Amino acid sequence: KFKKKIVSFEISSKRTIILISLEKNLSSSNAENLGAKFYDQFKDSNKIEYEVNSDTISSNLKNLIGNFLHGIKLKSYKFEKYKTKKDKGDISINVIGKNIPNNNDQLKFSSIEKGTFYTRDLVSEPGNILHPDEYAKRIKTLSKFGLKIKIYNDKELKKLGMNTLLGVGQ
């Protein structure tokens, strides 16, 4: 089992050094989990800007930074659409050094994050807001990404034997 260890040292009121120990052959999912753990540990801190020195990371862990940042981003999700008082701002991570994620990786991670957050938003909406008609309306907007979308009416759903779905959507 992968053991993650994050230790921080406060050097002044404005500066903290954070050390993260890594295993030699860190998998992508473990790097994401490490990012999530980092976010959990520091999300309530007064510090919102962090720097990651990628030169201290072995080049055979090529995708570590991208996966680490991806884990932070996924963990930072908050559904605050109906909150009157929003939580404080997101943390900012600046990567310095040679081992930074390339543009293709950043684009891939960004696309995954947008899709994940869109799905989480749909799941978090209350039923009186996201009823079947509203859900169909929102899903139709995804056709601009090349998705083929077919919206079934009640008659078609009955014909397909989806009675439970019809019952839930009443």
Summary of predicted features, one role per range:
Residues 1-170:
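Short amphipathic alpha-helical segment within the helicase RecA-like ATPase core
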